[in-house]
Amino acid sequence: MAKVAKKYAKALFDVALDTNQLDVVYEDLETISHSSFDFIKQLKAIDSNPSLTANQREEFVERVYNEANPYVVNTLKVLADNRHISIVENVFKSFQNLYNKYYKQDFAIIESTYELSEDEISRIVELIKKQTELSNVIVNTKINQDLIGGFRVKVGTTVMDGSVRNDLVQLQRKFERAN
């Protein structure tokens, strides 16, 4: 389903970009994705119900999502027609990846053993920007006592580990190789 979601997301992204509605489409799709998470079983039931016609599934989309951007609604109708309305969250995640790549931004999780100050976060964000060539970093912080000291940053699939725990693990590996 991930490939299918990527295709829908790419088509919607291209239309939104061409019509200069990228931010509006992103916001609507994000809202719909988050709200649909609570109703995933019902959406799967709609997808798998053989007695529902394509028109009935389209009417459902129109009634529930009628205030969304027309391009989002049309995408949802196509999803419903093809019995894929339940993958709307995956479509959003794929759309979000395209959106973040376009704006050269990404999410970062900064883990440390204590709550970081705004100044410390700003310095880490600047380091992330230099390492990743991102122009914008959306930060979530997390306290992780297992790190012992220092910090660990996760951006996408990349991990930058400056923790004391990582240093100790690396040191232990060197000792093991030496023996």
From Swiss-Prot:
Q: Where in the cell is it found?
A: Cell membrane
Question: What Pfam families would the database entry show?
Answer: OSCP (PF00213)
Q: Which GO terms describe its molecular function?
A: proton-transporting ATP synthase activity, rotational mechanism
Asked if the keyword Transferase belongs to this entry, the reply reads: no
Give the main location. Answer: membrane
What GO terms fall under cellular component here? plasma membrane; proton-transporting ATP synthase complex
Membrane topology (UniProt): Peripheral membrane protein
The record ties this protein, via InterPro entries, to: ATP_synth_OSCP/delta_N_sf, ATPase_OSCP/d_CS, ATPase_OSCP/dsu
The coiled-coil regions, if any, are none
Q: Where are the transmembrane segments?
A: none
Keywords assigned by UniProt, alphabetized: ATP synthesis, Cell membrane, CF(1), Hydrogen ion transport, Ion transport, Membrane, Transport
Functional description taken from the UniProt entry: F(1)F(0) ATP synthase produces ATP from ADP in the presence of a proton or sodium gradient. F-type ATPases consist of two structural domains, F(1) containing the extramembraneous catalytic core and F(0) containing the membrane proton channel, linked together by a central stalk and a peripheral stalk. During catalysis, ATP synthesis in the catalytic domain of F(1) is coupled via a rotary mechanism of the central stalk subunits to proton translocation.
Q: Which family does it belong to?
A: Belongs to the ATPase delta chain family.
Quaternary structure, per UniProt, is: F-type ATPases have 2 components, F(1) - the catalytic core - and F(0) - the membrane proton channel. F(1) has five subunits: alpha(3), beta(3), gamma(1), delta(1), epsilon(1). F(0) has three main subunits: a(1), b(2) and c(10-14). The alpha and beta chains form an alternating ring which encloses part of the gamma chain. F(1) is attached to F(0) by a central stalk formed by the gamma and epsilon chains, while a peripheral stalk is formed by the delta and b chains.
Q: Which HAMAP family match?
A: ATP_synth_delta_bact
Q: Which PANTHER family match?
A: ATP SYNTHASE DELTA CHAIN (PTHR11910)
| Name of the featured protein | ATP synthase subunit delta
